Structures are given as structure tokens and as C-alpha cells.
Amino acid sequence: MKLLLLALILVLSNINLISGNGLVWPHPRLPCSPYDERGCINTQKCSSTDCDSFKRRIYFDVAYNTAFTIYQHTIFKYYSANYYKVELIVGGKVYFIHKFGQFRGDDCEFDEIIPAFYKKVQFLDLSTPIKATIQFSFDFSSHPKHANIYYSCIDVWLFDSAYYNYCPTNSGGGSGNSGGSWSSGGSGNSGGGWSSGGSGNSGGSWSSGNSGGHSTGDCPTSSGGWTSGSHSSGSWSSGGGSGSSSGGQSSGSWSSGGGSSSGGHSSGSWSSGGGSSAGGGSSSGSHSSGSWSSGGSSSGGQSSGSWSSGGGSSSGGQSSGSWSSGGGSSSGSHSSGSWSSGGSSSGSHSSGSWSSGGSSSSSGNSGWMTASGGNTGGNTGGNTGGNTGGQSSGNSGWMTASGGNTGGNTGGNTGGQSSGNSGWMTASGGNTGGNTGGNTGGQSSGSSSSGGNSGWLTSSGSNSGSSSSGSNSGWLTSSGNSVSSSSGGNSGWLTSSGGNSGGNSGSSSSGGNSGWLTSSGGNSGGSSSSGSNSGASSSGDNTGGNSGWLTSSGGNTGGNSGAATGGNSGGNSGASSSGGNSGGASSSGGNTGGNSGWLTSSGGNTGGNSGAATGGNSGGNSGASSSGGNSGWLTGGVTGGNSGGATGGNSGGATGGNSGGATGGNSGGATGGNSGGASSSGGNSGGATGGNSGGATGGNSGGATGGNSGGATGGNSGGATGGNSGGATGGNSGGASSSGGNTGGNSGGATGGNSGGATGGNSGGATGGNSGGATGGNSGGNSGASSSGGNSGWLTGGATGGNSGGATGGNSGAATGGNSGATGGNSGGNSGAATGGNIGGASSGSSSSGGNSGWLTGGATGGNSGGATGGNSGGATGGNSGGATGGNSGGATGGNSGGATGGNSGAATGANSGAATGANSGAATGANSGAATGANSGNNAAVTGAANGNNGAAAGANSGAATAANSGAATAANSGAATAANRGNNAAATGAANGNNGAAAGANSGAATAANSGAANSGAATAANSGAAAGANSGAATAANSGAATAASGGNGASGAANPGSIVTPNDQNVSPLSNSDAAATAASTTGRNPRNPTSRAPTVTPTPTSSAEEPAAGGEDSSAISKYSIQSFGIFVLSMIIYLVI
């Protein structure tokens, strides 16, 4: 009896101290619910317990309000004195986030909204998700006998969607074999965008799943996330030499260069380069899904979503969504959605296959993955009106080209072909105004070729067939360009071996075609080239095409505008001229051609066809025709247009080119310049040694003192009236006809035609460039049968091609004199030339389409080349790229680009590559990287409308390479995209988010690491410092060396952005993606889906971490109420004990 009574006393005296509180959702370390109370009574702080890495699958967006479900098990009477507190733990530091009262005293579950707290964590670099822990504390310490504080912990990936959006729109899906856009599914429930699924529940965007049930990923708004496989998903691995990435769960791994990626569950692996994965190797496994394989073979039982480029084959029982380009075959019993170019796609269920080839030529529409929308309005409206009268060079895009050709081909292609407009990310509006007004006038009669349109991924069979299309480049391959027609050149991303070999072979020549990695066979072809803008008349032909990497909004704004009746005006008079090369009285639109760029090409042609005024492609393209090259992904920027032509044109021969005297180079008379005879398809082949180079000392050089130099007054100079000048109508004019000039837009033009020997050629005379001689530039040049403008590539080409390769020789000769002549360089060039130079009028014939530049440098390179003022790229005052005063690219005073001995600039040798030696990288010395001085570095004033960090050549591409201190993306302090305070100020990158530095989002300077920036290991470089980026120093670099560098610098340029969209899930001790139920729950719990405008964020504030001693004071009752409660409880206990003792 006494024992029972004693128990009752203890219960009565402690009745108000029983409590239990914790989180039900989202996924705490220890669950707390009516069914599992382990997490309800946890008294250890989160920092004292182990993180459950498996549950770190919540992506917590600080930009949104988020709901948390709390389970409260307490019978406190005075609950209003309690409060709950929310804190964030990052790197061992604790930060206060939110606090709210207990409010309720019953046993229940309820939801509490935690407001967005991005302002409280602005000091964190959330450009990519970081590990963090959210700590909920349930404080009951204000009650008698010091009740405990209970903790619930959630391990999350913290990110800010204002700068980092990891969730795609997952469209489509469903059971069966093929489900979902951007994806092809295998058996099971494959349905997710950007993915190809194996068996099981594979449906994740940007992923390919293996045969498991875990491949729905982390995105709460999609049925599939960014990951696939049960473990190790989405990992990036670049470089590694002979290393290997293999194992049972290697999924989504990137492997570039040398190594091998294989194993039982190798899914979504990227493999490029040597080793056993690409270039003749193989990527295989029992569940090889979504594998990228180039040149080799990808096979296995469930090979789904495999990419295969080259002569290999992709086959298997469930080969779905396979990409196959080239002579290979993609077949299987369930081959769905397969891409096949030039080969065969067959199977019992072959649906939605892409196959281009056969006898008809379609300029094709390439893109990176899809061109959804790109060709919707484009070829829909375009092919109806546009392609009716001719071929359309197609419209490509990297992500989407929606709207890109909507307005464009609709009005544009009505009368003839459109060179199309491509973009990397979006080309919305890119061709809206362009082809609308441009191609209306039925230009492109006769045999024409559009300036070509580059894409990012594939150019599936675009140029195959009997007709000529404006060339369509791709990202991976450009096979299928064989047959007898000429295309404006076709480039690829990985290889373009034979790219234009078969393609441009036969009777016509194309402006050469480069690739990403290699451009072997790039410029081979026949004796003639088709002109894109031929015909009776035309206005605003968008021949050159307007491509861009990220956005091309406004890409043709200045282009076809500035050129208006100018540049391309008088030019192709005579029988006909289309677009910028309109014939007769006037033309609008002008040289759409060189308006490309890597990041943005907004205003890309502003200076280009603008500055060129009536210069540019005017009078130029006399003779049969010349197609402006088409660039690709890796090499060539400037190399394009006037590049390819640069080789022929300014080169002609060592002494020919810009030098040679009156009959030399662009001058030489009618047949001189870019012509150099019946035809010259020098294009951009050979990289640095090709095109304008012909050898570092070749082409424009003809010898250091040869070519453009010949001495200060030699080469293109020859005296004021010499070289390109030759007199008012002399130089490149050589008489009535002029220009050919804008072959690569004003870009190629900058380098080639107008540049040729940049300095010499366009300079020598008067105010230089196309100015020098009134009708200078590519004037007289393109007479003769034809010349193709050459085609640039992705990475180096820029200065390397046209003005570069030749930059060394040609522009060197006379140091600053060369390109300078006057500091105008190409300034006076297309400008001074005014109605002179390229107007020349007389040239008729087919036409020439402006070239189209490539991916990285080409940007500014496109239009007037990197140099905002144009003429010559990069140079602040024009002249030749890079050089402060113009002169020759790279070196401050010119000479041989990159440095006196740069000779082989661009591609050249390692040491002098890119931009000379480390100290003098890019241009000038380290302090004066890019063009400007140290103080102005990154703000390359020459770049029209460019804001902080937008250096010369492209949107924000900081100095060519620069030294460690001033490397492309510079150090944290000098980062191209600036420090955290200046995040997202990359004005030129339209729509680019935080830290989209220069070339790509955070692509570290030229290539390289801080130590080896741009100079020593530039270009293709070694594996460690690879231009395309291998390993630790890959394009997007490591956190420490990333484009925008360290967190202290605002985290500009994270690796993910370098490959937009392919964001991977950070690996944390075998991270597992969310299940379907998790994803649904996450979606249901997120509120306020209207992200703020990143540009309106408050200034960066670094809060001081709070310790427990600094926590906000508890709210609730006053001390008197608590005392009364304590006395009451104590009284119950004493009274009970008296009763017990009496009994």
C-alpha cells in the first residue's frame, strides 16, 4: 500500500514535467512521431551527434518559405512560456534563423512555416549546394526542476535558387519504353526529362538510371531528379590521365581524357579522349545506360541513352534513346527516340528516330540535346516561306532555341535560305528580327550556301544530300557532310575529322570546318564555293547566321542594323547579293554572319556590321562566290570569317598576303587579297598554323618582317598607299570590287579581311584596316573564282585564326605600326572605309555568306572581333586583338602575338601559346591583362556595353590567359565576374547568373590553373592544365581555382555552370536520391514559389555566429507566474509526503 501511494505521490509531483518534442518532417536524424519517439526526447545538440549522410537528401532553398512538421507530446499546463528556435549550422558555426512560441499544450502534430532567410546567409557562397544542418531546439528550461531542452536535427544541402537552380522541368514520362522529353526510356517506368532510363524506376532529369528502383532524384518538382543509380551519382571526373572510374555503382560520372569508365552499373558516364572509353575504346557493362562514347562502341544488355559518335555501334536488347552519329548503327528491339546521323536506325520499335541524310539537304537544325521550339516557329514558319525558296541553314540551340527562329525564318526564309541562328542556351528572339526583315527579298537565288549555322551537339547529316545547306555544325560530330554540295562549313564539338572532307569535296568548297578538339580535314574541298547571298536581289540576308553560346538576344541587333545599308551594301552589287551583301542600291541586315559568341552575343554585331558601315562585305565578294565559314566549338573565333579568308586573303602566299607589295595580299589587285587565285579555301584549317598563319610566320607574315610587315612601311603598308591601301581603291580593292571583307562577319573580317595582317593589311595605309585604303580590306580580295571564309572552332582560334596565326607574322612585322598604322587599326577600318573600300560595287557573282564564329572566343570575335571598336579583336583601341594599342594581338606592342616570339600564338607551342609567356599573357604584362591596365582590368572599355569583368574578346572573358595574379578569371580579388560584392555584374552575359565568368559560367581563364594560366599550358595543354579542362583544373576549375574563385570572392564561376544544366548531386558518403514519396513531400512542403529578383538583393551582410549564450531570450510568462507554479508543485509534494508518513 505504501509503495503504491509513494508511486502516486511521485506522479502527482512530476505531472507537469513530462515532455517530448521533435520533428516529423523533413527527415530528421531521429524520427519523432506517435509511432517512434526516439527523436522526441533527444537532449544532445546536433553538433554532438553524427550526421546521417544517407538522409542528407533535402535541398533546402533559402529563397523560399518552408514548412516543417512538428510532433509535440507534452502536458505542460503553462506551455506559453516555451519557445522553439531554429538555427543553422555550417562549418561548425551556429547562426540564429528563426524563433516562435510553443502556442499549444496538447499532444499533436502541426506545421510551422519558416520564412525564407537568404538575407541572413548572404555571407555564404550558395552558388552550389553546401552541406549544412538545421537545428530545432525545444526549450522548456523555464519550468520547474529545469526541464530539458530537446533537439531535432536535419542534414541538408543548402542552396539559393536565385543563383543556382538545380531542378529542371521534368516533362513527360510514363511507363513503357520511351517516355519524357530529352530522354528515352528503357523498360520499366522510364519517364524523366533529360534522361534515359534503364530498367526499374529510372526517371531522372539529366540522368540515366541503372537497373534499380532509386533513380528518381532530388528535385521536388519533377518526377525525376538530377541523379541516377543507387550510389555515386552525377560525379564529375575530368582528367586523371590513365586513371579509371569503375565499380559497381559508377553512375553519371564524367570522365575525360585517358581513363576508363566501366563496370556493372556504369550509367550516364561521359568519356572523352583516349583510354578505353572514347576514340576507339569502349564503354560497356551489363547496365550501361546513358553512356557517352565517342569513336568507339557502346554495347551491353541494357544500353540505353548511349551516345555514340563515329564508326562505332550501339546495340542491344533495349537500346533506347541512343545517339549515334556517323556511319555506325543504332538498332535494337526497343530502339526509341534514337538519334542517328548518316547511319541507320532500325528496330522493331524504332520511334521518333532522328535520321538525316539521303539526297536532300537540309540545313538541318542542330542543338545540344534538343531544339524543341527552336525549329518550331523556325522551320515551321521558316520552311514554309523560307525554305520554300531555298535551304535554311537551320536553327540550333544548346538548351532550347524556342522562339529562336520563330520570327526569323518565318519572314526570313520566304525568299531564300537563312543562315539560321543558333545559341547555346537560348536563342529566343535571336532571329526574330533578323530573318524576319532579312530574308524577305528572295535572295539566295542560284546556287547558294548560307553562312552556316553552328550548334553545340550534333550536326546529324546536315549537309548530306545533293543540295547545299548553310552548313550545320554540331557539338559532337559533324559527319554526314559528304556529297557534292557545298556548305558554309560544318563544325563539331569533339571531332570533325572528315568534317568537311567529304562534305565540301566535289565541285564546291566550303569555308572550312573546324571541330572542338580536332579539325583534321577541316578545309578540304573542291575548286569553288557556293555563295549564300546570291540572287537577283536581297535585303538583310542573315547569311552569316547568328549564333551564341548562352544567349543571342540582340545578337543581330547591331549586326544587321549597323550594317544596314552600309557594309554589306554596295558590296554584292551586280547581279545579286543577299543580306548584308545585298546588291544594288542598298541592303539591310547586312552581315549577319559574324555575330556569334560564346556567352552572349547581345550587341554582338553591334560594332561588327555597324562599324563596318558600308565596308565589310560590300563590294567584296566578287567572283563566283565565297561562303563565310562556320565555326564550331573549340577553335577559331576570329579564325572564322575573315580567318579562313585570312589565310587565303591576307596570306595569299608568304609574300602575297598583306605584304608582297602592290600585288600582294588583300591588295594584289583584283585577284589578290583573299582571292589569291581561282579559289582559296584556306579556311581556318590548321589552327594557328592554318588560316592566316599558314605557319606562324606564314600567311600574313611571310616572315616576321614579311607579309604585313615588310618593315614598318612594308607589307600591307608599303607606304600609305601600299599594301591594303594601294591607293584609295587599291589595296584589297584592286579596283572596282571590294570586300569579301566580312566573310566572318566583321569578325573574321577583323582578323582576316580587315585584319588580314590586321595591322599591316588593314593598317598600313591611312587609318588602317579597311580604312587604310578607302576600299581596302577584303576588297579586291575575293575576286576570282571563290574563296571560303574559313570556319573557326571553339577555344583557341580567336586571335589564333585570322589575325592571330597571322597575328604573329603579319601584324608583327612592324610591331605597333603594323596593325596600328594609326591606333585606329580596324577602327578606321570598317569605319573609315565608310562607303569606300567595300562598296566598290562592281563585284557580283553568287555571294559570300559571313562566317559564324564559335563557342568561346568567337564572341566579340564574331562581329568586329573581340575589339569593341572593332576592326581588330581584343585591342582596346581596335588594332589587333589583345594588344593595348592594337598592334598585334596578345603582345602589348604587337610584334608577334602573345609576345615577340609568340609566332605560333593561339594554337602554337605550349610555352608561347594563348598569349605568350605567363608574365605577358593575353596582352601586355600581367598587370595589363586583356588590354587595359591593371586598374581597369576586366573592364575592357572597348567592349561595347560591357560592364565589370567583361573582357575584350567575349562577355567577361578576362585576359587571354594572364598570369596567376591576373589570370582569365583572375584571383579572388580580380575575378572576372568580380568579388562577392559584384556578383552577377557580368552585364554582357544576358541573363547570366552570379559568377558566369567570361567564357562560361566560371570557366577559368584560357584554360589553365593559376600557376599555368594561359601561357605555359594553354590551348589544349596537358591533362593537368587542359584547355578543355581536365581534372583539378578543368574549365570550370576547382573551388579554389574556379573562374570566380573562392567563396570569399563570391563563388563566381562554379563548375556546374560551365556545363549548364548538368548539375550533379554532391557526393556525401554515398548519397541516395529522394524517393517518389520524398519528392512529393518536398514539393508539397515548399511555399512561396516566386523567387526574388537576384538583382534586388540587399547588400552582403556577414552576421556574427551566435553561441548558445547569445540566443534570444525566451518569451512567455513573467517570473512571478513561474514562482507560483514552482510553489504549487512543491506544496503538492510536501503534502503528499506528510500523508505518507502519517499513514
Curated annotation (Swiss-Prot):
Residues 1062-1078 have a biased composition (Polar residues). The chain crosses the membrane at residues 1122-1142. Residues 177-1120 are annotated as: Disordered. Residues 21-1121 are extracellular. It comes from the Eukaryota. It is found in: Membrane. Keywords: Membrane, Signal, Transmembrane, Transmembrane helix. Residues 222-236, 284-296, 331-368, 393-403, 445-498, 506-541, 906-1059, 1094-1114 have a biased composition (Low complexity). It is a single-pass type I membrane protein. Residues 1143 are cytoplasmic. Residues 177-203, 237-283, 297-330, 374-392, 404-418, 430-444, 555-573, 580-596, 604-622, 629-783, 790-843, 851-905 have a biased composition (Gly residues). GO terms for cellular component: membrane. Residues 1-20 form the signal peptide. This is Uncharacterized transmembrane protein DDB_G0289901. It comes from Dictyostelium discoideum. The lineage of its organism: Eukaryota, Amoebozoa, Evosea, Eumycetozoa, Dictyostelia.
